[in-house]
Amino acid sequence: MNPQLASTILYCLFFFFLGIAAVLAFIQRQAVKRRERLDAEAEAVLESARREAETRGNQIIVDAREKALAIKAEADREVAAMRETEQIRDRKLDAREDQLASGQESLRKAQRGLESSQTRLAAQMRNLTEQRAELDRLVQESQRALEKVSGMTQEEAAEKLMQSLRQDLEHEIGSTVLKHQRELGRRVDAQAREMLLTAMQRYASVHTADTTTSTVGVPTDDMKGRIIGREGRNIRAFEKATGVDLIIDDTPGVVVVSGFDPVRREVARMSLEKLIADGRIHPSKIEETVEQAGKEIQAFILQKGQEAAGEVNVSGLHDRVIEMLGRLHFRTSYSQNVLRHSVEVAFLAGMMAEMIGLDGDLARRCGLLHDIGKAADHELEGGHPKIGADLLRRSKENDEVVHAAKGHHDEIVTEFPYTMLVATADACSASRPGARRESLERYVKRMEELESIAQRFDGVQQAYAISAGRELRVMVGSQQVSDERAAAICRDIASTFEKELTYPGEIKVTVVREARFTNTAK
């Protein structure tokens, strides 16, 4: 081998191992440094954890001390409060003991005073007994002396004295009652007049007067013959379909429809006008026209009922009630349209209710429905108050509304104030001038009844009904009747009217006692 090459190889191996040794030494040095760094970091983490643990431990100790101090302070306060309560209880107990001792002392004093009073009272009772015995002796002596002087016994004198006292008392009572009646009458009349006038002035209504017949114009007499038909078949078919009487006489241009049922009469009138306008008049056409007119009248009835309810601001009515309300448009009472009368009563009752602090809406509802029974009294038994009350009860109306319909003519005991309001409004609507009219025979009979009732009473000389029966003037004798007796006669006559007569509004009774003294100068 070449010595130079071998030397070169040796040098190369030497430096190679030397490099490896250097690298290993470097790696070892880096590993040592990393381990030292990790040890330092671990030491730092341990130190930080140790410091944090110390800090938390100190905080826990501080919190525990604060809680302990708070608990101790609370316990101290409770102990102090209990001590204070105990002291207050002790003071109250001491005060009550003092009061008890004082009360016992007062009781002993009162007992001593009572014993002293009983002793004095016993002495006074003995004196009083002696004085009473002496007084009885003196009274007996006086009675014997009075009986001897007057010639009357004790019983006779007492009876005469009682009669005198009774007469004086009756005179005083009559004067007092008369005075208070006049004052009360003035106040009540003034308040009632103001309330009624205010309500009536705030509302004014138009009333229509209907009869039991309706007239229908015909263009020619030939049309009358067509209405009658061959052998009267058309008129018989018409009367059978409508339930009314058709009167055809010599009156030119007029045919009269007569019937007591206003709804049927209106259906007949409308049907006849349609037949005359159409010109075709035969039984089948009559039946068709009457059926159509009946439907139109039914719709008109519902419309009238809804209009009346809306006019007085009443809502929530049953369909049957609205229908019956609309039927009142065709009903009259003493020539007064019942539907307009019901609307007027509703307004008057509502205004009066609001004046005295009641529910105006409920009063208007009661007033509107009070005469609802008049629309069905031809179909059911009983008077219209009972029929109307039954209908409203079945329609789920309030008790106030049902009672107002049943009792607005004073036929039952009044349970609700709305019944009296409706009765008052009903009387106002019926009795105002021009609202109703009655026959001459009925008018004369009512005047005679008023005068005959007044003539029943002793001391009445003459009686005159004036102002269309709204007032009665009674003349009494001044020798037979005193002022107090005249006032009693006036009350009795008014009470008799209320019990025996039925009348709208009120009747004023005036008793006149006149004394005349005549002398002649010569």
From Swiss-Prot:
Source species of the chain: Rhodopirellula baltica (strain DSM 10527 / NCIMB 13988 / SH1)
GO terms classed as biological process: mRNA catabolic process
Keyword Signal: no
UniProt name for this protein: Ribonuclease Y
Main enzyme class: hydrolase
Domain called KH: residue spans: 212-272
Pfam families to which the protein is assigned, alphabetical: HD, KH_1, RNase_Y_N
Domain spans labelled HD: 338-431
Residues in coiled coil: none
Gene Ontology MF term list: RNA binding; RNA endonuclease activity
EC number, UniProt record: 3.1.-.-
Alphabetized UniProt keyword annotations: Cell membrane, Endonuclease, Hydrolase, Membrane, Nuclease, RNA-binding, Transmembrane, Transmembrane helix
One of the record's GO cellular component terms: plasma membrane
Disulfide cross-links: none
Keyword Transmembrane helix: yes
Subcellular location: Cell membrane
Membrane topology: Single-pass membrane protein
NCBIfam families tied to this protein: HDIG, RNase_Y
Function per UniProt: Endoribonuclease that initiates mRNA decay.
Family designation: Belongs to the RNase Y family.
Transmembrane segments: 7-27
